[in-house]
């Protein structure tokens, strides 16, 4: 192998390492948002919104770095086989993580109102937050090293979130005659944001499963 080829491989490896590090950092930061939400919901901490928004800015910054790095890599390095699949997985998945961070902000904005009333079924919402945190940490474990079984577990956990969401929304919409409309709307928005957050984590998990299930043509045995 020529010195030029070795240098190109080294640059490609360095770019992939930076992208992967930012990809994993986004997942860690999202888990941090969910831990903050879970603790605030349990303790009645009204300052969590600022913390969640600060962490969301870190997610946005990592997303921007990955986008620039990935586009440069695809244009200049022409990755193939596993390198190309990994690059595309990260490039396609970071918008899902960015949106999940946005939904964490939506939850944070409504957390105190949800906790203060009964319209949103606070005990069930606490369960949903715990499941979402478990989804985020399981996805992180499934991403390095990549693990299809753990990625599948993320989807199974999301089924539990969806079941909680369906029951809660049905009860919220049925409502009690004395429930304030504002409380009902806040509860509905909080539950919807939590459910959508989980869906974005599932999107990433499904891409991980697909990457591991099908080898690229040049990876397949002759």
Swiss-Prot record:
Q: What are the annotated GO cellular component locations?
A: cytoplasm
In its UniProt record, which GO terms are filed under biological process?
intracellular phosphate ion homeostasis; negative regulation of phosphate metabolic process
Keywords linked to the UniProt accession: Cytoplasm
Q: Which cysteine pairs make disulfide bonds? A: none
Q: What is this protein called?
A: Uncharacterized protein DR_A0161
| Superkingdom | Bacteria
Where is it chiefly localized?
Answer: cytoplasm
Per the entry, what this protein does is: Not known; probably involved in phosphate transport and/or metabolism.
Q: Where in the cell is it found?
A: Cytoplasm
Q: Name one Pfam family in it.
A: PhoU
Which family does the record assign?
Belongs to the PhoU family.
């Amino acid at each position: 192998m020529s010195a030029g080829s070795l240098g190109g491989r080294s640059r490609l490896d360095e770019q992939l390492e930076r992208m992967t590090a930012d990809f994993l950092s986004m997942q860690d930061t999202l888990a941090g948002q969910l831990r903050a939400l879970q603790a605030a919901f349990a303790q009645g901490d009204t300052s969590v919104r600022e913390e969640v928004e600060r962490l969301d800015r870190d997610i946005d910054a990592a997303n921007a770095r990955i986008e620039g790095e990935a586009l440069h890599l695809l244009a200049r390095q022409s990755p193939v086989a596993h390198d190309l699949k990994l690059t595309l997985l990260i490039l396609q998945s970071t918008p899902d993580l960015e949106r999940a961070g946005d939904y964490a902000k939506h939850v944070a904005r409504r957390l105190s109102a949800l906790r203060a009333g009964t319209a949103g079924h606070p005990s069930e919402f606490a369960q949903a937050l715990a499941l979402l945190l478990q989804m985020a940490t399981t996805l992180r474990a499934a991403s390095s090293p990549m693990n299809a079984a753990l990625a599948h577990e993320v989807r199974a956990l999301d089924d539990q979130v969806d079941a909680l969401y369906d029951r809660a929304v049905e009860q919220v919409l049925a409502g009690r005659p004395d429930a304030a409309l504002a409380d009902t709307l806040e509860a509905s928005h909080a539950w919807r944001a939590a459910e959508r957050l989980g869906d974005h984590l599932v999107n990433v998990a499904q891409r991980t499963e697909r990457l591991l299930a099908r080898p690229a043509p040049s990876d397949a045995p002759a």
